[in-house]
Amino acid sequence: MPSRVVRSVSVSVALAGVLALVGCTTTAPEPEADATVTTVRPADGTTAVTDADAATRAIETSRSLFESTPLVVVSADDDDASFLAAQVAVELGVPLLLDGRGEAVAESASPAPSSTGAPDEPAGGSTAEPEASALDDEIERLGAATVIAVGDVDAESFGDLDVVASDADAEALREATGMDVSDSPDDLTPAAIAALPAPERSTSTPSASAAPIHPMPEPAAPLEGTIALSTDAAGDAAALATARAAGVPATVLPAGAADPLGSTAAIGALHDAGAASTLLLGEAFGTLPDPDWAVRTAATGFELPGGGQHLFADRLYVALYGAPEVPVLGVLGEQDVPATIERARTTAAEYAGLTDRTVVPTLEIIATVAAGDAGDDGNFSNELATSRLEPYIDAAADAGVYVVIDLQPGRTDFLTQAKLYESLLAKPNVGLALDPEWRLAPDEKHLTQIGSVSAQEINTVSDWLADLVNRESLPPKMFVLHQFRLDMIENRQDVDMSHPELELLIHADGQGGQPDKQATWRALHADAPAGMAWGWKNFYDEDLPMLTPEQTMRDVTPEVDLVTYQ
């Protein structure tokens, strides 16, 4: 049975409709007053539709975008049916809902025993009755009078509604609806659904030979100010189709990488759309720690060299270290700004053929310099004016060079000094480094001992910096902790790694013979916080000998994420 009509219209009415169509012109009929589809733009910001159940996601998407419709499409909760049904829903401009009731009945018939031997209570109300109620409630909320049922859907379950039922077969669905439905594998994908044209008004009329659809919906005008991101998981087809039916543009991401910050396609789509409302459609987006920040940040359009906004995994940073115009503190200060940028790019280029990762030239600029004298503020640290750093940062931004500003605070604390450079840290290409070697106790002076900092103080800085990043819709920042002795960071296991706005890196600063440096490297890795990235420093004068780029990539294991030259 390819198609059938259940409680649609009487035979005489259907025949009258056919006869009327024979004598009419090709002009589309005027829609009935109650046939208009009404959509609504979601609230400003990000709406994440991430429930584990695809049928629930479809309902939530419908609630987010549709106020009323005379007709809905209901598909069996399986891939074949939903991809075919999606084409009909988008052309008609109506929601696509999923009927998961058959699965729920089967699951509820044989409940899994709990550890006590008694049947488990169903999680999240996923029994047959609640699922049926959720679907029925949504159809009632929408005011739909007609259902197009595709696949293994119980047409009798819709009560007094008119039902046009079709097997999950393209030919059957064409016969049932009079619409052009494709069963080409290329058309049965989330990407193909996203590419379907938005519904057009007064054109979606089934042929005279089709099963009756009454009243015929009049699609709403495409929603403006809204964009959707979905995944390529088949279970997201219904939610995605509902978004397209509302005229919402959609971009599809891999389900295994459902992160706007990591996707050039998502960044470009969000930036170009400039939308006030964003829908994230897919269970995979549920892993995002802060979806709203991720969307706001991606929408800025900023990308690191190599694409995306995440710092590590597929990038290697190669940095020059030092202070502006102070050659004794490192190679960064040995030349003017243009020459520094060129030297950074040349140094980084030596690594390009040694790794599959994108190599990013970097500057690590000492912003507060450890001092032998207390100075007017008594903190044994000279704070450089932001105006001395800005030319480097601006030139770096133009050249695709990342920047890290380094703090050597003396007797003050890291947070106090970090706040002095808030205007610089508010730039997307600027990270922050803390150098505990130069963190003094109230009665200490530099070079008489190695300084240290507590995890608690580090966390006060990371809390503040993460808040800045989130508030300003900035991409994740590199947050560097310099260390070459275990006691330089007290209670290192308590360093907060939970901020999605920061990507932390321990920078091994040891100098001297390579056996000693390798021993330090191994010691620092022991019991380090999970998820930490790693940096290695090559000293031109102090290392015996300094590693070549080839040796750095070959001999330093695990492989480094940042190589700094001083």
Where are the predicted features?
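Hydrophobic faces of well-ordered beta-strands that scaffold small-molecule active sites
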Residues: 316-322, 361-365, 403-407, 428-435, ...
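N-terminal module-boundary/linker segments of secreted carbohydrate-active enzymes
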Residues: 290-339
